[in-house]
From Swiss-Prot:
This is Protein OPG137. GO terms for cellular component: host cell cytoplasm. Induction: Expressed in the late phase of the viral replicative cycle. Homomultimer. Interacts with OPG160. Phosphorylated by a OPG054-independent mechanism. Keywords: Coiled coil, Host cytoplasm, Late protein, Phosphoprotein. Belongs to the orthopoxvirus OPG137 family. The gene is OPG137. InterPro entries: Poxvirus_A11 (IPR007755). It is found in: Host cytoplasm. Required for viral crescent formation early during virus morphogenesis. It comes from the Viruses. It comes from Monkeypox virus.
């Protein structure tokens, strides 16, 4: 038995000793087997610091058997080791073996890696459960390359470039379609209309603050449904206006006839009844009557009734 003080053991040598059967002082009694293990670990650490040592397959095999399978006469103190799962690679030329022993101070455990060089240009690595990264790399962040002001300036320039690209690709088509819809200078088919511009134009005519950017969240199917709904509402409104103008003309004629018969109380009735009142009160009924009579959206008929309504209000027919 040899008495070795604990302070003589190096801190980077990782050992796991059971404290059973040891006195509670700073001097532990270490057996010859334990001393041989410490010597072996010390030799491995020295080889790691000096250079990577290449051994023959027979020496590695005998050394592994000695490390992984201790003798039966070893003391009660147990040093836990993990046997790596390796595979045998048969190829020519005969492989050379190299063992690397890594000592981790944080995890307090030993990891082994075996590199098998198959040829000069290729190398197969057989590792244990713990994966080892030889050369870790890290991508530098923008905060290291550029300062805060530079990053903000780069973002602002990128936003300006994206806006310019977007305006250059869409402005000409949108402006052309908007001119067609607003002024009607050029005949066009319904498939050629930019439906988004038509929706925005209709919203602006009705006092709704809507822009093309607000419609970016809508899909093409939703734009088609909105455009179809607006078109149907526009046609329905035109039919109601035709029936409304007919009703106003009839009311003016009835008012003049009643005044001719001496009913002075009826005077001013045509002034009180406007298109807005008719639309609110019987607008849906006017649309139903127009649909039932087959009255479509006829611009000529609408213009004729509008002119006739103005003259009937000013001229006494009866």
């Amino acid at each position: 038995m040899t008495t070795v003080p604990v302070t003589d053991i190096q801190n980077d040598l990782i050992t796991e000793f059971s404290e059973d059967n040891y006195p509670s002082n700073k001097n532990y009694e270490i057996t010859l087997r334990q001393m041989s293990i410490l010597t072996h670990v010390n030799n491995v650490v020295d080889r790691e610091h000096n250079a990577a040592v290449v051994s023959s397959p027979e020496e590695i095999s005998s050394q592994l058997n000695e490390d992984l399978f201790p003798d039966d006469d070893s003391p009660a103190t147990i040093i836990e080791r993990v046997q790596p799962h390796t595979t045998i690679i048969d190829d020519t030329p005969p492989p050379t073996f190299r063992r690397e022993l890594l000592i981790s101070e944080q995890r307090q455990q030993r990891e082994k890696r075996f590199n098998i060089t198959v040829s000069k240009n290729s190398e197969a690595i057989m590792e244990s459960r713990s994966m080892i990264t030889s050369m870790p790399t890290q991508t530098p962040s923008l905060g290291v390359v550029y300062d805060k002001d530079k990053r903000i300036q780069m973002l602002e320039d990128e936003v300006v470039n994206l806006r310019n690209q977007r305006s250059n690709t869409k402005s000409s088509d949108n402006l052309d379609n908007f001119t067609r819809i607003l002024f009607g200078k050029t005949p066009y088919k319904s498939t050629e209309v930019n439906k988004r511009i038509a929706i925005v134009n209709y919203a602006n005519l009705n006092g709704s603050p809507l822009s093309v950017e607000d419609l970016d969240v809508c899909s093409e199917d939703e734009i088609d449904r909105i455009y179809k709904t607006i078109k149907q509402y526009h046609e329905s409104r035109k039919r109601k206006i035709i029936v409304t103008n007919v009703i106003i003309i009839v009311i003016n004629i009835i008012e003049q006839a009643l005044l001719k018969l001496g009913f002075e109380e009826i005077k001013g009735l045509s002034t009180d009844i406007t298109s807005e009142i008719i639309d609110v009160e019987i607008g849906d009924d006017c649309d139903a009557v127009a649909s039932k009579l087959g009255i479509g959206n006829s611009p000529v008929l609408n213009i004729v009734l509008f002119i006739l309504k103005i003259f009937v209000k000013r001229i006494k027919i009866i």
